Amino acid sequence: MSDTLSVCGLTICRGSKLRTMLPVPGTEIEIPLTIINGAFDGPTLLVTAGIHGGEYPGIAAAMELGRSLDPQEIHGSLIMLHPVNIQGFWARREFIVPEDGKNLNRVFPGNPDGTLSEKTAGLISSSFFPQADFYVDLHSGDIHESLHPYVYYPCLLYTSPSPRDISGS
């Protein structure tokens, strides 16, 4: 890992954090961006939240994560876009980008010469996916949906050995 991380013309030194607004090329739209370049070597994780503007829990989680992590304690880098569909967020639109009526989640890999949804997807596909070792796209219940708390923890079934197994009989 080098001492700097470069993303979309931004350079972030090792052990530092950057919070800024990222312009979507060919538009007047800017997306909130947080980059944490950890003090130690490690992989790069890309996190997107708010592909659907009304999915508030993922947006809030990404914002809190960006605020709370100390780059001096991080191995690798974390890049977060939150909310990606900033126009849908402000307009309280559940599934679409208001300017073009498209579901941003359905237009990847995007098109730099297309509509706002396509340009946004194109920016993420061309500038962020190549940087990432891992990618997490946060989705959740939307504006009209009821959220019930739950945790899903997959694990392997483990059974204790029987006395016969232990004795070898």
Predicted features along the sequence, with ranges:
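Short glycine- and acidic-rich boundary segments immediately preceding or forming the N-terminal edge
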Residues: 1-28
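Short gly/ser/thr-rich secondary-structure transition/capping motifs
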Residues: 27-30, 117-119
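Short beta-strand-to-loop junctions in surface cap/lid or active-site-entrance loops
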Residues: 33-41
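Active-site/substrate-binding loop(s) of hydrolase catalytic cores
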Residues: 42-43, 56-66, 70-160
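Short HxH-centered metal-ligating active-site micro-motif
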Residues: 49
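Single conserved hydrophobic/aromatic residue that forms the stacking wall/gate
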Residues: 158-169
